[in-house]
Amino acid sequence: MFNQYTRLLILSLSFNYTLIGQDVRLNEIVSSNSTFYDEDGDTPDWIELYNYGNKIINLQNWHLSDDRDNLKKWSLPDISINPNNYLLIWSSGKNRKLLYPRTIIRRNDYYKYLIPNIEPDPNWTYLNFNDDNWDYGQSGFGYSDDDDKTVVPDGTISVFLRKKFEIENLDDIHSIFLDIDYDDAFIAYINGIEIARANINGYPPEFNSEDVNSPHEAEIYRGGVPERFVIEDHQTILNEGENILAIQGHNINSQSSDMTVIPFLSAIFKNPSLQGHEPDQILDLESYFQLHTNFKISSNNESIYFTNENGKIVDEILVDGLLPGNSVGYSNLSNEVVNFIRTTPGYRNSSQEFVGTVKEKVSFSHQGGIKDSELNLELSGKKLGQVIRYTRDGSEPNSNSNIYKDKIKIDESTSIRARIYEEGYIPSEIKSESYVIGSNHDIDILLISTDPENLFDDENGIYTFGPPGSYYPNIPFFGANFWEDWEIPGHISFFENNSKRSAKFNTGIKIFGGWSRGQNGQRSLSFFARGKYGDPNFKHKFFDNLEYDDFESFVIRNSGQDWLRSNIKDIMLTSLMRGSEIDFQENNPVATYINGDYWGMYNMREKINEHMLASKHNVNANEITILTNNADVLKGDNNEYNQLINFINNNDLSNSENYEYVSSQIDIDQYTLYQASNIYFNNTDWPGNNIKFWKHPKTKWRWIMFDTDFGFGPWWNLNNYRENTLSFSLEVNGGDWPNPPWSTLLFRKLIMNNSFKNQFINRYADELNTRFKPENVVNHIYEVYSTVEPEIIKHFERWKNDSSVGYNINNIKSHVNHYVNNMVIFARNRHSIARNHIMSQFNIRNFHSVMIENENLNFGYVKINENIDIDTDRWTGQYFETVPIEIRAIPNPGFEFSHWSGDLSSKNEIINISLMKDLNIQANFIYTGPLNVYPNPSKDLVYIVEEGVESFDVIIYSISGKIMGELSQVNKIDIRHLPKGIYTLKIKSSSNIFYKKIVRD
């Protein structure tokens, strides 16, 4: 992420004590950077210093500040700047001085190594392993690339390496990482803990494994650089003193033409250190000499102060009205402070300079959106000496665009974009409005504006195929432009249906999705809020069901495999899990326009990333790890998860201690629901695909549900509700797709534990008794369909004749209803089939009903398996023989639980039942409010008192439940005729029923 410009800046630094001079100044300042990256991959503001004199200047105890009342806000370290050289300082707020990189293990270092012909001792990765019988050789290891110090025989499948190293002070280490050049795969460990791997499966892979994903060519011998792996949690992995780096290098097969393993291990120290060696230039560790202030820069009316060691202000520059990506600094011609469009860190400031930036903004007389009829648009906001230039096609205005002189007639759908120009000034920010004339929509509306060439240019448009011959000729047309990770600038306007609420943002736009990029003419899009476009986030409540309204990105999805069918399958299935532990993307159907052209209906969705998860769970997004498929990294690293999978693969989870460890790492409650849901859905584009899971230091591993288009069976299979997805998800030897062995491993191993098995079965049963009940799912299908139905006809009319469709759609309503009805058929039939799959898989003979009754819901409620809160006076569910269920009585405030009655009797609030027949159980609660019974214990009379009540009806029960007496309209009871013991009084007033225990002495 650190580019050539910032490397040049490092060359200007000197770390010697030198003469103090004054010929250094602020040279260039950027308050909204999006082009240059720091060592973390971020794009913070920056300040550039320039030594315009002829002496080296030491900057120790010089200061930068954005506050005149606190000129010593950030002090520079002991660092010097050479004559005619530049120093870039990130104004990020990270407050970093110097760090010191050292390479602990270098190329050409000696290792103990082994080329095995049998599986090595499993302890070979640990420090105390005896490697006396291993060979001794220099790195690199391999053959045929002419860069191998230790040449191994041609056709070698694997080589095992061990190298000891020392760490003196763990607290002085800022970070540590492995750089490694490899052909074709490797796994690396420190002190027995996996720290990195690439291109190979298995936990651990066998010594002769050829389960390498694909050929991977080494880089160094052909002028490239090794791949870097940052080691997370190094404080828990490393020892002070001796450590061991162990690497298992793999070839793709014995016929491979070459093999390479060249490792480097480097550490970044907080203080100068003599440990290790000066880093090899190929590692590019100069980036760790970067400096960061403890403040950021405002783009509006803020001065930056530069003071020398005596506290004297050497220079001061006002930052005011800078647009994203522009800078302020000194002119090379006049030596005056000017503005620049092109920033030049490490070089002379640009010769294209401007007096300043136009601060005025264009105002539109009419807000964009859906309009009933044509309108005359007025643009205003300019002052004397300025002109407004505008475009009508979505492109950004430039110096050749139309000059606004009179009202603009808007009689067709269009996008107007305008900005103010003034001679010698950078033009103002662009303002955009989109107008749709004469259309009507009953859902929210999204209007997109961008230069048409950004999307549709035959050569470079992100929506197009690209030049002929540049892509694979069959679906999904790999290599086409729409498969590239290209981002274009644009503008969006969002209008809420039946509301005046709207939102407008500048944005970046990409093509989004998988197979549907090439399969569907309507391509999915993703939108990004970035500082370089002016909007660092999308602040708007796009989704009614979310409590938060701050987004860094979102997507509009074309419905994937369900496009031009029901168009609701994925949003229906994922939203069915609303209110559960499952993380999923909320949705909102939107009528969409691109540059005024109707582009059909999309499903607006949250974008799965660390920001979505942070918003849902109130954690720090920067600390989140997200993995996909076979532990591929989306964010963070996979070391911790791979170690967990390694443990799971090599240990018996029927052992309670092993299972307890795994359950301490995985959110078992969430995982059982995730598995049960995908199995019920019959999602057969899973589990070997469409899986994402995540972790934060404060959480366990959790799974995300997304892209469920294959759920409820693919559209071509009408009897898919019969398919046994439970067996499918436990398959030991599935093919490469959709259920390869790695994808079923976790579930297969967990199900061996009886506690997990019972929890999974009960969670599946809980959902079948509630969320997945046929009537509930059918109602949900129709409810979701009702949200898109108003737009369906328009959407299909827009796309039904597109060349990507491949079939005729004659009657749109009938066509869509066919696919909606298919889902209804699935919902009505899957329920009973799913129960049969459970009984078949786990050899369960039968299931039975349990009826829970609660005559007064105001007194308390019943909870089943810690999942279902029963809020009705009579509830029935079905559960399986030999799988105990937990039933808990929970009294409301002012009440207490009395006892269970019916087909069983118990005074315990929690009961565990193995159903071997149908049961009917009543929960009984008693009132413990202001009613008083006294004296208690008593030998003769008991009085009943409640404020405002004169008399009560009373039934006296023995401890066995036998009625010992009934009285009407009394406020005292004579109990002298009762034998000594404990009794329960059922006391009924005009408004309440109370239960009170009394003791007859």
Question: What is the role of each PLM region?
Answer:
Residues 895, 929-934, 938-1001:
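C-terminal outer-membrane/trafficking sorting elements
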Residues 80-83, 87-90, 269-284, 301, ...:
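Short, compositionally stereotyped local motifs that mark structural "simplifiers"
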Residues 316, 327, 336-341, 345-353, ...:
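Middle-to-C-terminal accessory/interaction subdomains
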Residues 111, 134, 157, 165, ...:
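Aromatic-lined ligand-binding clefts that engage carbohydrates, nucleic acids, or primary amines
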Residues 99-124, 284-345, 505-517, 789-795:
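Conserved beta-structured recognition patch
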Residues 99-174, 201-230:
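Extended carbohydrate-recognition surfaces in non-catalytic/accessory domains of CAZymes
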Residues 448, 466-636:
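Conserved ATP-binding subdomain of kinase catalytic cores across diverse folds
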Residues 20-68, 99-101, 166-182, 271-302, ...:
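A structural motif detector for short, solvent-exposed N-terminal "entry" segments of globular domains
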